[in-house]
Protein backbone atom coordinates (compact mmCIF):
# COMPACT_ATOMS: atom_id res chain seq x y z
CA UNK A 1 0.00 0.00 0.00
CA UNK A 2 1.42 3.37 -1.07
CA UNK A 3 2.27 6.00 1.56
CA UNK A 4 2.49 9.78 1.44
CA UNK A 5 6.28 9.41 1.25
CA UNK A 6 5.93 7.33 -1.93
CA UNK A 7 3.76 10.05 -3.48
CA UNK A 8 6.25 12.76 -2.50
CA UNK A 9 9.16 10.79 -3.96
CA UNK A 10 7.42 10.16 -7.29
CA UNK A 11 6.28 13.79 -7.58
CA UNK A 12 9.67 15.13 -6.50
CA UNK A 13 8.26 17.22 -3.66
CA UNK A 14 8.10 17.14 0.14
CA UNK A 15 5.45 15.28 2.11
CA UNK A 16 4.28 18.68 3.39
CA UNK A 17 3.51 19.77 -0.17
CA UNK A 18 1.58 16.55 -0.80
CA UNK A 19 -0.44 17.24 2.36
CA UNK A 20 -1.26 20.79 1.21
CA UNK A 21 -2.46 19.49 -2.17
CA UNK A 22 -4.68 16.85 -0.56
CA UNK A 23 -6.14 19.10 2.13
CA UNK A 24 -6.15 22.34 0.09
CA UNK A 25 -4.61 24.13 3.07
CA UNK A 26 -2.13 26.29 1.15
CA UNK A 27 -1.55 27.57 -2.38
CA UNK A 28 0.54 25.16 -4.49
CA UNK A 29 1.79 25.98 -8.00
CA UNK A 30 -0.35 24.39 -10.72
CA UNK A 31 2.44 22.24 -12.22
CA UNK A 32 3.41 20.98 -8.75
CA UNK A 33 -0.22 20.21 -7.92
CA UNK A 34 -0.61 18.28 -11.18
CA UNK A 35 2.56 16.27 -10.45
CA UNK A 36 1.24 15.33 -7.00
CA UNK A 37 -2.23 14.39 -8.31
CA UNK A 38 -0.63 12.30 -11.08
CA UNK A 39 1.51 10.43 -8.52
CA UNK A 40 -1.55 9.84 -6.31
CA UNK A 41 -3.42 8.38 -9.28
CA UNK A 42 -0.54 6.17 -10.45
CA UNK A 43 0.12 4.82 -6.96
CA UNK A 44 -3.60 4.50 -6.15
CA UNK A 45 -2.82 6.35 -2.93
CA UNK A 46 -5.60 6.87 -0.40
CA UNK A 47 -4.94 9.32 2.47
CA UNK A 48 -5.57 8.13 6.01
CA UNK A 49 -9.07 9.33 6.88
CA UNK A 50 -8.22 9.59 10.57
CA UNK A 51 -4.97 11.50 9.99
CA UNK A 52 -6.70 13.84 7.57
CA UNK A 53 -9.58 14.44 9.98
CA UNK A 54 -7.13 15.56 12.67
CA UNK A 55 -5.80 18.24 10.31
CA UNK A 56 -9.01 19.54 8.76
CA UNK A 57 -11.29 18.70 11.73
CA UNK A 58 -13.81 16.79 9.62
CA UNK A 59 -14.21 13.22 8.40
CA UNK A 60 -17.14 14.04 6.07
CA UNK A 61 -18.97 11.15 7.71
CA UNK A 62 -22.21 10.83 9.65
CA UNK A 63 -23.27 8.07 12.05
CA UNK A 64 -26.85 6.79 12.13
CA UNK A 65 -28.30 4.67 14.93
CA UNK A 66 -31.69 3.17 14.13
CA UNK A 67 -33.99 0.64 15.83
CA UNK A 68 -33.84 -1.76 12.89
CA UNK A 69 -32.85 -1.78 9.23
CA UNK A 70 -35.04 -4.80 8.46
CA UNK A 71 -38.48 -3.17 8.65
CA UNK A 72 -39.24 -1.76 5.18
CA UNK A 73 -40.36 1.59 6.61
CA UNK A 74 -37.03 2.19 8.40
CA UNK A 75 -35.06 0.70 5.48
CA UNK A 76 -36.60 3.28 3.13
CA UNK A 77 -35.76 6.11 5.55
CA UNK A 78 -32.15 4.86 5.78
CA UNK A 79 -31.95 4.79 1.97
CA UNK A 80 -33.22 8.38 1.82
CA UNK A 81 -30.69 9.49 4.45
CA UNK A 82 -27.81 7.75 2.65
CA UNK A 83 -28.75 9.29 -0.71
CA UNK A 84 -28.95 12.78 0.75
CA UNK A 85 -25.65 12.32 2.64
CA UNK A 86 -23.97 11.24 -0.60
CA UNK A 87 -25.24 14.30 -2.46
CA UNK A 88 -23.84 16.50 0.30
CA UNK A 89 -20.43 14.79 0.14
CA UNK A 90 -20.81 12.69 3.31
CA UNK A 91 -20.43 8.97 3.99
CA UNK A 92 -22.94 7.22 6.27
CA UNK A 93 -22.16 4.67 8.99
CA UNK A 94 -25.46 2.99 9.91
CA UNK A 95 -25.87 0.66 12.91
CA UNK A 96 -28.92 -0.99 14.47
CA UNK A 97 -29.59 -1.89 18.10
CA UNK A 98 -33.09 -3.44 18.51
CA UNK A 99 -33.61 -1.49 21.76
CA UNK A 100 -30.54 -3.04 23.44
CA UNK A 101 -28.97 -0.34 25.71
CA UNK A 102 -25.57 -2.06 25.75
CA UNK A 103 -25.47 -2.12 21.95
CA UNK A 104 -26.45 1.56 21.81
CA UNK A 105 -23.59 2.42 24.17
CA UNK A 106 -21.08 0.37 22.16
CA UNK A 107 -22.26 1.86 18.88
CA UNK A 108 -21.97 5.41 20.24
CA UNK A 109 -18.43 4.75 21.46
CA UNK A 110 -17.45 3.23 18.11
CA UNK A 111 -18.87 6.14 16.10
CA UNK A 112 -17.16 8.64 18.42
CA UNK A 113 -13.82 6.86 17.82
CA UNK A 114 -14.42 7.12 14.08
CA UNK A 115 -14.74 10.90 14.62
CA UNK A 116 -18.04 11.17 12.77
CA UNK A 117 -19.03 14.79 12.19
CA UNK A 118 -22.56 14.21 13.47
CA UNK A 119 -25.07 11.61 14.67
CA UNK A 120 -28.62 10.88 13.56
CA UNK A 121 -30.54 8.74 16.06
CA UNK A 122 -33.91 7.42 14.94
CA UNK A 123 -35.87 5.05 17.18
CA UNK A 124 -39.56 4.33 17.53
CA UNK A 125 -39.53 5.00 21.30
CA UNK A 126 -36.97 6.19 23.87
CA UNK A 127 -36.48 5.39 27.55
CA UNK A 128 -35.05 7.96 29.94
CA UNK A 129 -31.92 5.80 30.27
CA UNK A 130 -31.32 5.91 26.52
CA UNK A 131 -31.80 9.69 26.46
CA UNK A 132 -29.34 10.07 29.36
CA UNK A 133 -26.85 7.92 27.44
CA UNK A 134 -27.19 10.06 24.33
CA UNK A 135 -26.69 13.24 26.37
CA UNK A 136 -23.28 11.92 27.50
CA UNK A 137 -22.14 12.24 23.88
CA UNK A 138 -23.44 15.79 23.53
CA UNK A 139 -20.11 17.10 22.18
CA UNK A 140 -21.04 15.46 18.86
CA UNK A 141 -23.66 17.38 16.83
CA UNK A 142 -26.75 15.19 17.02
CA UNK A 143 -30.33 14.91 15.82
CA UNK A 144 -32.45 12.60 17.98
CA UNK A 145 -35.75 11.94 16.24
CA UNK A 146 -38.71 10.79 18.33
CA UNK A 147 -42.22 9.83 17.24
CA UNK A 148 -43.43 10.42 20.82
CA UNK A 149 -44.28 13.61 22.74
CA UNK A 150 -40.77 13.91 24.22
CA UNK A 151 -39.74 17.41 25.26
CA UNK A 152 -36.01 16.58 25.15
CA UNK A 153 -35.64 15.45 21.54
CA UNK A 154 -36.39 16.58 18.03
CA UNK A 155 -39.88 15.47 17.04
CA UNK A 156 -41.27 13.65 14.02
CA UNK A 157 -44.96 14.49 13.87
CA UNK A 158 -46.34 12.02 11.35
CA UNK A 159 -49.92 13.03 12.26
CA UNK A 160 -50.79 9.40 13.00
CA UNK A 161 -54.18 10.42 14.39
CA UNK A 162 -55.08 12.04 11.06
CA UNK A 163 -53.75 9.02 9.17
CA UNK A 164 -55.80 6.58 11.25
CA UNK A 165 -58.86 8.75 10.76
CA UNK A 166 -58.24 9.01 7.00
CA UNK A 167 -57.88 5.24 6.57
CA UNK A 168 -61.04 4.44 8.53
CA UNK A 169 -63.01 7.23 6.85
CA UNK A 170 -62.18 5.73 3.44
CA UNK A 171 -63.55 2.34 4.51
CA UNK A 172 -66.73 4.00 5.81
CA UNK A 173 -67.14 6.01 2.59
CA UNK A 174 -66.93 2.72 0.67
CA UNK A 175 -70.00 1.55 2.62
CA UNK A 176 -68.31 -0.56 5.30
CA UNK A 177 -69.93 -0.54 8.74
CA UNK A 178 -68.36 -3.69 10.22
CA UNK A 179 -64.73 -2.61 10.52
CA UNK A 180 -61.92 -4.27 12.46
CA UNK A 181 -58.37 -3.10 13.17
CA UNK A 182 -54.96 -4.70 13.64
CA UNK A 183 -53.08 -2.00 15.51
CA UNK A 184 -49.63 -1.85 17.02
CA UNK A 185 -48.95 -2.13 20.74
CA UNK A 186 -51.29 0.46 22.24
CA UNK A 187 -48.79 1.51 24.91
CA UNK A 188 -46.65 2.97 22.06
CA UNK A 189 -47.36 6.49 20.82
CA UNK A 190 -47.62 5.76 17.09
CA UNK A 191 -49.94 2.77 17.55
CA UNK A 192 -52.13 4.55 20.07
CA UNK A 193 -52.65 7.69 17.99
CA UNK A 194 -53.52 5.72 14.84
CA UNK A 195 -56.07 3.78 16.90
CA UNK A 196 -57.49 7.04 18.27
CA UNK A 197 -57.96 8.25 14.68
CA UNK A 198 -59.81 5.00 13.95
CA UNK A 199 -62.01 5.57 17.02
CA UNK A 200 -62.82 9.13 15.96
CA UNK A 201 -63.93 8.12 12.46
CA UNK A 202 -66.09 5.30 13.84
CA UNK A 203 -67.63 7.63 16.43
CA UNK A 204 -68.43 10.29 13.82
CA UNK A 205 -70.18 7.68 11.67
CA UNK A 206 -72.04 6.39 14.75
CA UNK A 207 -70.57 2.93 14.21
CA UNK A 208 -69.92 0.50 17.06
CA UNK A 209 -66.40 -0.83 17.58
CA UNK A 210 -66.51 -4.58 18.21
CA UNK A 211 -63.80 -5.29 20.85
CA UNK A 212 -63.31 -8.77 19.35
CA UNK A 213 -62.21 -7.12 16.11
CA UNK A 214 -59.50 -5.00 17.78
CA UNK A 215 -56.21 -6.91 17.74
CA UNK A 216 -52.73 -5.78 18.79
CA UNK A 217 -49.55 -6.65 16.93
CA UNK A 218 -45.98 -5.33 16.90
CA UNK A 219 -45.83 -3.93 13.36
CA UNK A 220 -44.32 -7.15 11.91
CA UNK A 221 -45.79 -9.33 9.11
CA UNK A 222 -46.14 -12.32 11.44
CA UNK A 223 -48.33 -10.17 13.73
CA UNK A 224 -50.72 -9.46 10.87
CA UNK A 225 -50.74 -13.15 9.99
CA UNK A 226 -51.40 -14.33 13.56
CA UNK A 227 -54.00 -11.63 14.29
CA UNK A 228 -55.91 -12.48 11.11
CA UNK A 229 -55.89 -16.18 12.00
CA UNK A 230 -57.34 -15.31 15.43
CA UNK A 231 -59.94 -13.11 13.78
CA UNK A 232 -60.97 -15.87 11.38
CA UNK A 233 -61.89 -18.19 14.28
CA UNK A 234 -64.79 -15.87 15.15
CA UNK A 235 -68.32 -16.57 13.99
CA UNK A 236 -68.93 -13.00 12.79
CA UNK A 237 -66.31 -11.21 10.71
CA UNK A 238 -65.80 -7.59 9.67
CA UNK A 239 -66.22 -6.66 6.01
CA UNK A 240 -63.14 -4.42 6.21
CA UNK A 241 -59.93 -4.28 8.22
CA UNK A 242 -57.54 -1.41 8.94
CA UNK A 243 -53.98 -2.71 9.39
CA UNK A 244 -51.86 -0.04 11.04
CA UNK A 245 -48.85 -0.71 8.83
CA UNK A 246 -48.31 -2.30 5.43
CA UNK A 247 -46.30 -5.32 6.56
CA UNK A 248 -49.04 -6.38 9.00
CA UNK A 249 -51.46 -6.01 6.07
CA UNK A 250 -49.24 -8.37 4.06
CA UNK A 251 -49.38 -10.95 6.87
CA UNK A 252 -53.15 -10.56 7.13
CA UNK A 253 -53.63 -11.03 3.38
CA UNK A 254 -51.46 -14.16 3.51
CA UNK A 255 -53.60 -15.67 6.29
CA UNK A 256 -56.81 -14.89 4.40
CA UNK A 257 -55.46 -16.42 1.20
CA UNK A 258 -54.47 -19.63 3.02
CA UNK A 259 -58.09 -20.01 4.13
CA UNK A 260 -59.33 -19.66 0.55
CA UNK A 261 -60.64 -16.13 1.08
CA UNK A 262 -59.95 -13.20 -1.23
CA UNK A 263 -59.13 -9.52 -0.84
CA UNK A 264 -61.21 -7.44 -1.39
CA UNK A 265 -64.04 -9.80 -2.42
CA UNK A 266 -64.35 -11.41 1.04
CA UNK A 267 -62.69 -8.72 3.13
CA UNK A 268 -61.34 -5.27 2.28
CA UNK A 269 -57.96 -4.29 3.74
CA UNK A 270 -56.26 -0.92 4.06
CA UNK A 271 -52.67 -0.49 5.24
CA UNK A 272 -50.44 2.33 6.45
CA UNK A 273 -46.98 3.70 5.42
CA UNK A 274 -47.08 3.12 1.63
CA UNK A 275 -43.82 1.17 1.60
CA UNK A 276 -42.42 0.59 -1.89
CA UNK A 277 -43.51 -3.06 -1.98
CA UNK A 278 -47.17 -2.29 -1.16
CA UNK A 279 -48.02 -1.49 -4.78
CA UNK A 280 -46.90 -5.04 -5.71
CA UNK A 281 -49.07 -6.88 -3.16
CA UNK A 282 -51.82 -9.13 -4.53
CA UNK A 283 -53.97 -7.13 -4.78
CA UNK A 284 -52.08 -3.78 -4.77
CA UNK A 285 -52.63 -2.29 -1.31
CA UNK A 286 -54.75 0.75 -0.59
CA UNK A 287 -52.78 2.54 2.11
CA UNK A 288 -51.77 5.78 3.83
CA UNK A 289 -48.67 7.40 2.35
CA UNK A 290 -45.89 8.89 4.50
CA UNK A 291 -42.97 10.54 2.71
CA UNK A 292 -39.84 8.66 3.80
CA UNK A 293 -37.81 10.69 1.28
CA UNK A 294 -38.82 13.99 2.85
CA UNK A 295 -38.27 12.69 6.38
CA UNK A 296 -34.73 11.50 5.64
CA UNK A 297 -33.82 14.68 3.77
CA UNK A 298 -35.11 17.01 6.48
CA UNK A 299 -33.40 15.06 9.27
CA UNK A 300 -30.02 15.31 7.51
CA UNK A 301 -30.50 19.00 6.70
CA UNK A 302 -31.11 19.71 10.39
CA UNK A 303 -27.98 17.72 11.32
CA UNK A 304 -25.78 19.47 8.72
CA UNK A 305 -26.96 22.82 10.07
CA UNK A 306 -25.91 21.74 13.58
CA UNK A 307 -22.53 20.55 12.31
CA UNK A 308 -21.96 23.91 10.62
CA UNK A 309 -22.87 25.86 13.77
CA UNK A 310 -21.59 23.42 16.41
CA UNK A 311 -19.49 26.10 18.13
CA UNK A 312 -22.44 28.44 18.63
CA UNK A 313 -23.94 26.83 21.73
CA UNK A 314 -27.13 24.87 22.36
CA UNK A 315 -29.39 24.28 19.35
CA UNK A 316 -33.18 24.46 19.47
CA UNK A 317 -35.02 21.17 19.04
CA UNK A 318 -36.63 20.82 15.62
CA UNK A 319 -39.91 19.41 14.38
CA UNK A 320 -40.53 17.52 11.15
CA UNK A 321 -44.14 17.33 9.98
CA UNK A 322 -45.14 14.44 7.73
CA UNK A 323 -48.65 14.76 6.30
CA UNK A 324 -50.50 11.47 5.64
CA UNK A 325 -52.17 10.97 2.26
CA UNK A 326 -54.65 8.33 1.10
CA UNK A 327 -53.38 6.12 -1.74
CA UNK A 328 -56.23 4.20 -3.38
CA UNK A 329 -55.33 0.92 -5.08
CA UNK A 330 -57.22 -2.41 -5.30
CA UNK A 331 -57.55 -3.89 -1.79
CA UNK A 332 -60.73 -2.05 -0.74
CA UNK A 333 -64.06 -2.55 -2.50
CA UNK A 334 -67.18 -0.43 -2.33
CA UNK A 335 -70.26 -2.17 -0.93
CA UNK A 336 -72.61 0.79 -1.36
Curated annotation (Swiss-Prot):
Is the main repressor of the genes involved in the de novo synthesis of purine nucleotides, regulating purB, purC, purEK, purF, purHD, purL, purMN and guaBA expression. PurR is allosterically activated to bind its cognate DNA by binding the purine corepressors, hypoxanthine or guanine, thereby effecting transcription repression. One of its GO terms (biological process) is purine nucleotide biosynthetic process. The keyword Transcription regulation applies. Hypoxanthine binds at residues 73, 188, 190, 219, 273. PROSITE patterns: HTH_LACI_1 (PS00356), HTH_LACI_2 (PS50932). SMART domains: HTH_LACI. GO terms for molecular function: DNA-binding transcription factor activity; transcription cis-regulatory region binding. Consists of two structural and functional domains: an N-terminal DNA-binding domain, approximately the first 60 residues, and a larger C-terminal domain, approximately 280 residues, which imparts the function of corepressor binding and oligomerization. Homodimer. This is HTH-type transcriptional repressor PurR.
